[in-house]
Amino acid sequence: MPDTYIAIMLQSLKKKEQVLDEIIRLDDRQKDTLTDPECPFDVFDETVEAKSACIDQLNQLDSGFEKLYAQVAEELDQNREDYAKEIRDMQQCIRRVTDKSVKIQAQEARNKELMREKFATIHRQAKAVRKNSRAITGYYNSTVSYTHLRAHETLANLV
């Protein structure tokens, strides 16, 4: 029975690597959406939702791994030599998972800064639009007033 649990744990770690690879890919896609001014916001939203699904999957994998480990920890500890290869394989997977996690953290920090810059740009653009809108409204009001005034003068001259 412990052999089966250990095999499942190793399989779980490999699946976690695949999910982390997907998150790395999605982080790159997110960077592209943040740096492309023409990219619709929907694409960014889809990427965030896909990453959220991956994170949920990681949490499930972690939970399952921990439960299995709790059941075989004593067996692994007592019979280290019997499970040396499996332990080595798991350690290698854990190293790769850790490396990928570090890469993801760096990508997330970069994307957070890009997002901050993008929102600052959007804020500046919105401010400029409001300012231009007020200027156009002011121009329109002054034009209407002038036209109204000229129409009044013409009417007075006709009578």
Which ranges hold each PLM region?
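Conserved small/polar residues in nucleotide/adenosyl-binding loops
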Residues: T147-T154
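Amphipathic alpha-helical coiled-coil segments
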Residues: A53-L68, R96-Q107
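Coiled-coil heptad-register positions
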Residues: L34, E38-F41, Y69, A73-L76, ...
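Short, solvent-exposed, charged loop/turn and helix-capping segments
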Residues: Q60-D82
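Charged, polyampholytic interaction/assembly segments that form long, compositionally biased interfaces
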Residues: E117-S145
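Acidic/histidine-rich alpha-helical segments that form the ligand environment
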Residues: I87-T121
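Long, hydrophobic N-terminal alpha-helical segment
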Residues: P2-Q57
